[in-house]
């Protein structure tokens, strides 16, 4: 394996100036057509224009060489365009939400392989026109396995011919080793060995202009084929595949890793070690919210209980009223009307303790209630579950009234009794 080491020696001789911001290089890796073929790689400057180091070899040879560059700006992995087939499709906007499910069935009639064995990636969409790359799943799995074996953190995995510049009026062409790569304006890409390249071009005639980024031209190895015009082959500044791959501005959609092969997002990888802590914290929050909700529910139940108790007492005092919405406001209305008759204050002073007693002894029901304003006394017919309840009520009432106990009797499972409560004043 050949590795250029000039950059390392220059870096050792040329110290960094103060204030210089160190920029990480970028890494380009090209996987071979054959599984046991040589893997090519280059480390280039952050802008991709300068070669810093390069090499080729097997996974066992390349991995330790790449380990010397743990921090890179980006890593782009090129796969052979010969293993990828491109199709043009019309993709209505309403179908794009489910594009991964729709595309395989749109292409099913054009494919010789079962769609279950193929991977589909939409590389670009312009209006309603889309370019779809189709590759066998076992090849995708092999490429990803090779990347893992090399210890790569891949940013983009794409067909090698897709890094060629795009020309609206013609094809782009580049020779790499013994392979010619072509990119069409539609986004389709082709590749052919040099020995077959002429046949490929002849079969595609009439040809548009071909913008070549390699030194080879019509006058060279392709001279044996008939051309319409000499000007069809337009020489461009000579460059190489790795330079184009490092300097190309690639959209995110050009990545073949879509659908089942889509990479995990960086933030997901960052949060993965904290997943257990996050789950525990979420459970804690759930318990806190549940406890707060239960406490709120209990308070609501208590408030509802006392509201119902107020309604019950009010209806016992005023049995003729059936519509009780706000017992407190309705009681105040009664007191205001009574006060207009001159006995309001005395009634209020005696009624307040009675309301408290009925609230404290919720098991006791008022069967009837009358008030004698002249005597200043309440006459109550009460009903409870036992003699003890009525006696307890009588003892508590003695703190506020002069109590005169009447007859008590057992009626089925209830105890009834009468009390006269007179003001202590």
Swiss-Prot record:
It is found in: Cell inner membrane. CDD domains: ASKHA_T2SSL_N. One of its GO terms (biological process) is protein secretion by the type II secretion system. Residues 291-425 are periplasmic. InterPro entries: ATPase_NBD (IPR043129), GspL_cyto_dom (IPR024230), GspL_pp_dom (IPR025691), T2SS_protein-GspL (IPR007812). Residues 1-273 are cytoplasmic. It is a single-pass membrane protein. Keywords: Cell inner membrane, Cell membrane, Membrane, Protein transport, Transmembrane, Transmembrane helix, Transport. It comes from the Bacteria. One of its GO terms (cellular component) is Gram-negative-bacterium-type cell wall. The chain crosses the membrane at residues 274-290. Inner membrane component of the type II secretion system required for the energy-dependent secretion of extracellular factors such as proteases and toxins from the periplasm. Plays a role in the complex assembly and recruits OutM resulting in a stable complex in the inner membrane. Provides thus a link between the energy-providing OutE protein in the cytoplasm and the rest of the T2SS machinery. Type II secretion system is composed of four main components: the outer membrane complex, the inner membrane complex, the cytoplasmic secretion ATPase and the periplasm-spanning pseudopilus. Forms homodimers. Interacts with OutM/GspM. Interacts with OutE/GspE and OutF/GspF. Belongs to the GSP L family. This is Type II secretion system protein L. The lineage of its organism: Bacteria, Pseudomonadati, Pseudomonadota, Gammaproteobacteria, Enterobacterales.
């Amino acid at each position: 394996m050949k590795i250029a080491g000039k950059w390392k020696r220059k870096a050792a001789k040329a110290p960094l100036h103060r204030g210089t911001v160190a920029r990480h290089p970028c890494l380009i890796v090209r996987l071979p057509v054959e599984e046991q073929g040589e893997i090519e790689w280059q480390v280039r400057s952050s802008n991709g224009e300068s070669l810093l180091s390069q090499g080729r070899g097997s996974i066992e040879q390349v991995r330790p060489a790449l380990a010397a560059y743990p921090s890179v700006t980006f890593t782009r992995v090129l796969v052979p365009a010969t293993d990828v087939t491109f199709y043009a499709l019309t993709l209505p906007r309403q179908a794009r939400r489910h594009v991964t499910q729709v595309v395989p069935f749109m292409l099913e009639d054009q494919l010789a392989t079962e769609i279950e064995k193929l991977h589909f990636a939409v590389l670009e969409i312009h209006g309603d026109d889309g370019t779809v790359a189709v590759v066998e799943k076992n090849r995708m799995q092999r490429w990803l396995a090779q990347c893992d074996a090399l210890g790569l953190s891949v940013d983009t995995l794409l067909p090698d011919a897709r890094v060629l510049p795009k020309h609206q009026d013609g094809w782009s062409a580049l020779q790499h080793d013994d392979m010619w790569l072509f990119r069409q304006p539609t986004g389709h890409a082709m590749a052919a060995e040099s020995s077959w390249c002429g046949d490929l071009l002849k079969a595609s005639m009439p040809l548009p202009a071909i913008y070549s980024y390699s030194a080879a031209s019509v006058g060279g190895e392709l001279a044996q084929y008939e051309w319409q015009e000499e000007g069809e082959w337009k020489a461009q500044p000579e460059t190489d595949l790795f330079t184009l791959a490092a300097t190309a501005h690639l959209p995110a959609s050009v990545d073949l890793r879509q659908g089942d092969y889509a990479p995990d997002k960086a933030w997901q990888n960052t949060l993965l070690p904290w997943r257990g802590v996050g789950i525990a914290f979420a459970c804690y929050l759930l318990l806190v919210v549940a406890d707060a909700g239960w406490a709120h529910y209990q308070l609501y139940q208590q408030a509802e209980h006392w509201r119902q108790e107020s309604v019950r007492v009010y209806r016992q005092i005023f049995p003729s009223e059936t519509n009780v919405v706000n017992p407190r406001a309705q009681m105040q209305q009664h007191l205001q009307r009574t006060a207009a008759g001159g006995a309001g204050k005395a009634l209020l002073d005696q009624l307040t303790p009675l309301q408290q007693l009925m609230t404290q002894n919720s098991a006791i029901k008022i069967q009837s209630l009358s008030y004698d304003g002249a005597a200043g006394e309440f006459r109550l017919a009460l009903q409870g579950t036992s003699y003890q309840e009525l006696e307890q009520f009588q003892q508590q009432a003695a703190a506020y009234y002069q109590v005169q106990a009447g007859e008590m009797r057992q009626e089925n499972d209830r105890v009834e009794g009468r009390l006269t409560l007179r003001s202590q004043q």
